[in-house]
């Protein structure tokens, strides 16, 4: 019985050990590709590590990536997209804010950041971002829809009170 228990424990823990090893190996490949100047390959390896262990991949980004390098924006975008897909809006917002620090007038990034704020329940901050988007791009559909709906609902609430 004891042998059988040990067998099952080792059987179930083996994939965890292999997963950790493969994440480390992939992150080493990311580092090697960055050092070799192969940014496209580095982003590809980085993207492959995210589903294996997103927390370890994020830690790699914060500790090993030069935030002033060209590739840091691409890696931050990958993490932002992954967290958005997992509906972890707090982390996605964090990475979109990181991207906005480098390019504060990037309309696409502002739009997604505002969307994350709505998902996080931060409508006032989203309102400010959508207003900034309209200053940069008056024809932005998402900003016009959000602001139109927001001001309509505010007027309706004011009528009721």
Feature-to-residue mapping (PLM):
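Helix-start (N-cap) detector for alpha-helical repeat units in TPR-like alpha-solenoids
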Residues: 23, 57, 73, 107-108, ...
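Register position in tetratricopeptide repeats
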Residues: 35, 85, 119-120, 153-154
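Single-residue signature of alpha-solenoid repeat helices
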Residues: 42, 92, 126, 160-161
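Conserved structural position within tetratricopeptide repeats
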Residues: 51, 67, 98-101, 131-135
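Short coil/turn linking the two alpha-helices of tandem helical-hairpin repeats
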Residues: 57, 121, 153-159
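Canonical tetratricopeptide repeat
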Residues: 61-64, 74, 78, 112, ...
